[in-house]
């Protein structure tokens, strides 16, 4: 560990002795999040809210008029500021940091996996849906930050409006993925490379 080492990069006052403290008795990996979606973590609460509303309300994509996503300000700056790269990402990395794109994929598919970038980056229907998204700094989400990367989503359709918020995104220790969800993510990631 030097002045530009790993600990110096991530901790204001690193104490290397803490790395081995309670070794073998405290399992810190049980205190870390496992992301269910292949996108920026700031998008996950909103993606979970969209998936929940889609599942519960049988929302038809054709009926969607507009979608508003509320995030903490820091998240909004990273994935929500409205510019062309957020509405029409040109590659997977742009897509990972685009709330409109990730939200549109989840609204269409019910979830999002790694292969959805290839499937949706040039899909006119997905991009048209992403164009209906507006991302804002939300006072409630901001009040939850930095303890939680909360998100709230409002979907207006031609027949009615829906709203759902998620305080703790799926994958956090307090809202960990089920074994089935973790297995599904694993299968999604390895399927292109492993035979049955």
Locate predicted features.
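Terminal-appendage/accessory-domain detector
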Residues: 1-196
């Amino acid at each position: 560990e030097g002045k530009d080492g790993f600990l110096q990069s991530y901790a204001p006052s690193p104490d290397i002795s803490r790395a081995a403290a309670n070794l073998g008795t405290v399992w810190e990996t049980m205190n870390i999040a496992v992301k269910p979606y292949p996108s920026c973590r700031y998008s996950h609460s909103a993606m979970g809210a969209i998936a929940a509303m889609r599942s519960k309300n049988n929302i038809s994509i054709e009926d969607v008029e507009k979608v508003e996503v509320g995030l903490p300000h820091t998240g909004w700056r990273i994935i929500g500021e409205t510019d062309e790269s957020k509405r029409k990402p040109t590659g997977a990395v742009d897509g990972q940091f685009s709330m409109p794109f990730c939200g549109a994929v989840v609204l269409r598919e019910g979830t999002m996996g790694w292969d959805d970038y290839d499937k949706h980056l040039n899909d006119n229907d997905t991009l048209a849906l992403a164009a209906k998204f507006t991302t804002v700094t939300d006072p409630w989400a901001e009040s939850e930050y930095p303890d939680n990367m909360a998100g709230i989503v409002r979907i207006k359709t031609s027949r009615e409006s829906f709203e759902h918020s998620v305080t703790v995104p799926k994958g956090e220790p307090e809202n960990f993925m089920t074994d089935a969800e973790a297995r599904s993510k694993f299968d999604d990631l390895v399927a292109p490379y492993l035979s049955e």
